[in-house]
Amino acid sequence: MPKELEDAKGALKTFGVDLQIANDVDADIIHAHTWYACLAGYLAKMLHDTPLVITAHSLEPFRPWKREQLGGGYNLSSWAEKDAYEHADRVIAVSAGMREDILTAYPNLDPDKVVVVHNGITMSQFETPADDDPGWKVFERYNIDRSKPTLLFVGRITRQKGLPYLLQALHFVDPNIQVVLCAGAPDTPEIMEEVKTAFAKLDEERGNIIWIEEMLPKPELNALEHGCDAFICPSIYEPLGIVNLEAMACGLPVVASATGGIPEVVVDGETGYLVPVDQLHDGTGTPTNPDKFVHDMADAINRIMADPEKAKRMGQAGYERARDHFSWESIADKTVKVYEDVLAERK
């Protein structure tokens, strides 16, 4: 096996499934999501002459850290994504920022074929739990003090989610602020060890921090989001940021990096605060000035937690924004319009 494809068994197995899917397709239009399904969509288009729509939730050229996880499979995922995108009838970007990234990564794409349709959420899934809802037991189980002002992070332990930067920023955050980290599913043992080391140092210095490594059941996560005071998203790569929408649907103000599609979700000064971040253009998204990014993040956290009444107003504004602009009903209508346009071109 070529050196470039070492550790690529996982990707090759995915391609095997893609071949089976492509052979069985019997549809008027194909809609594929992520590189895992892109090859199936591309092959089905060639086999059955069926128009192909792809929704871009992320881009392999902008996630070079995935090589840590996929090994040689990253070369295969990158190849599959590129070929599928360049032969698709439409590519849906989940944000305007993502559309720009798509055209940068794949300049051979016709810009007219790349359209924006945001992701959405089902608001009913994020309603305030009843007082006797068992989800509230999460606070007791993890010794989370509901009387303390509490900041919440929810995300996988990956390079793109920016958790190491948050752990650095928390050294400069008011120690009276309780911090809850729902962080698990590390991409690699290396990044898990990095996070463990940073957490241990932080816990020794400031304390008042709870790390939940397991994936919480939805009722418990919903109760946790309704029981905290603010949400933090330190991502360095985020095509849209569903996690922020979910927090807003629970009425939480959000502090988030001003990267990718996040500024299309979080309105600075209205639904929370955006943390400015200048980034390298080498695909990694690494902040050009990590110290500034860390200190600006800490400052935004301190500001939002220092004014509970303003934080509540921001949380209410965020709830209304999530409800009014990111409902699945409106997004479904926009997606159907994409299908209709593609099919009309075939007539």
Residue ranges of predicted features:
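A conserved mid-protein helix/loop that constitutes part of the nucleotide-sugar donor-binding site
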Residues: 149, 153, 158-172
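Short alpha-helical donor nucleotide-sugar binding micro-motif in glycosyltransferases
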Residues: 222-228
